[in-house]
């Protein structure tokens, strides 16, 4: 086995990020169980959204892939395959991307003349087994958001042109971020994100000074700063890998399942996505804390992240949707 080495710019350590616990938790849980369905992060400009997302990708272990494979395919039992290790893919989707750039293109002329399927992979192929990040997803064309969500949910990307069809694996954690001042995502699209984290600018002056100082020190000497947090980074990486291995053994009681569904029902949440995601996220949080049984505290920690964006908006209502979820949780679970 050989290792592919690339020169990458230094990434700010995930464990060095101050505050924004809600966003960090949502990202960690999605990495533990990608079937949660990704996370939408909404918040003010300059609150560390992009920095945190790149930091979680940098924290993930290397993955084994077949050499020169365009889809990051995992090794099979074929002994003739040459295997290499690469960093977990972290793909940025630019706002101006076309459908062909995202999904890939089929060379129709080559297919007709040579009788072979000539496929040029897109960003979904590159993101397979990694993270696909869309900044300002609320400004992205709805049609493209639909494609991303469909692929993230099914784990497959299908490209069809002139009667020729190609399908490949596209399993990735979809992370979207945006500023609410620039417009909201349509409710039917927002509902398809597993979690919704809301982040705000730090108001505490002492905390603000700490953030500024830490970023300044990192920019002056990135290597020294990364070494300072290496031990904490390795500990968190080990914890995430352990949770990934443990999650299949985690159980949730029928009573808790019933109460989660009761919360969703009383909040008038459309469909069953809210129920499913809350169950999954609670299991992931239990696994993250090295437990095989879900406790009330696990559900309390994740339920707002899983449900706040699924509530119908009433313009006359003054209570925040997150507070509404938390209040009902306390009534039903106490």
UniProtKB/Swiss-Prot annotation:
GO terms for biological process: chlorophyll biosynthetic process; photosynthesis. Pathway: Porphyrin-containing compound metabolism; chlorophyll biosynthesis. Gene3D superfamilies: Magnesium chelatase subunit I, C-Terminal domain (1.10.8.80), P-loop containing nucleotide triphosphate hydrolases (3.40.50.300). One of its GO terms (molecular function) is ATP binding. ATP binds at residues 43-50. It catalyses: protoporphyrin IX + Mg(2+) + ATP + H2O = Mg-protoporphyrin IX + ADP + phosphate + 3 H(+). Keywords: ATP-binding, Chlorophyll biosynthesis, Chloroplast, Ligase, Nucleotide-binding, Photosynthesis, Plastid. It is found in: Plastid, Chloroplast. Involved in chlorophyll biosynthesis; introduces a magnesium ion into protoporphyrin IX to yield Mg-protoporphyrin IX. This is Magnesium-chelatase subunit ChlI. The lineage of its organism: Eukaryota, Sar, Stramenopiles, Ochrophyta, Olisthodiscophyceae.
């Amino acid at each position: 086995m050989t290792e592919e080495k690339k020169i990458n710019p230094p990434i700010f350590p995930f464990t060095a990020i101050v505050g924004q616990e809600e966003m960090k938790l949502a990202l960690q849980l999605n990495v533990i169980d990608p079937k949660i369905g990704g996370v939408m992060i909404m918040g003010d400009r300059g609150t560390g959204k992009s920095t945190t997302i790149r930091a979680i990708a940098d924290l993930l272990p290397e993955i084994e892939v077949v050499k020169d494979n365009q889809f990051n395919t995992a090794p099979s039992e074929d002994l003739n395959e040459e295997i290499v290790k690469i960093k977990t893919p972290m793909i940025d989707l630019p706002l101006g991307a076309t459908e062909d750039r995202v999904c890939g293109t089929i060379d129709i002329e080559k297919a007709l003349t040579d009788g072979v399927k000539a496929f040029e992979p897109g960003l979904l192929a590159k993101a397979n087994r990694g993270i696909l990040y869309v900044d300002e997803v609320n400004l992205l064309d709805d049609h493209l958001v639909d494609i991303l969500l469909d692929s993230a949910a099914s784990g497959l990307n299908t490209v069809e042109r002139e009667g020729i069809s190609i399908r490949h694996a596209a399993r990735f954690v979809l992370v979207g971020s945006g500023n609410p001042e620039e417009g909201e995502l349509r409710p039917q699209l927002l509902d398809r994100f597993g979690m919704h984290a809301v982040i705000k600018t730090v108001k505490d002056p002492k905390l603000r000074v700490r953030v500024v100082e830490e970023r300044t020190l990192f920019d002056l000497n990135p290597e020294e700063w990364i070494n300072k947090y290496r031990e904490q980074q390795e500990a968190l990486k080990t914890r995430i890998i352990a949770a990934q291995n443990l999650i299949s053994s985690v159980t949730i009681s029928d009573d808790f399942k019933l109460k989660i569904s009761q919360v969703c029902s009383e909040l008038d949440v459309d469909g069953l996505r809210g129920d499913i995601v809350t169950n999954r996220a609670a299991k992931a949080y239990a696994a993250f804390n090295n437990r095989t049984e879900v406790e009330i505290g696990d559900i309390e920690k994740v339920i707002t992240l899983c449900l706040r964006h699924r509530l119908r908006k009433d313009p006359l209502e003054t209570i925040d949707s997150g507070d509404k979820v938390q209040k009902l949780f306390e009534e039903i679970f106490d």
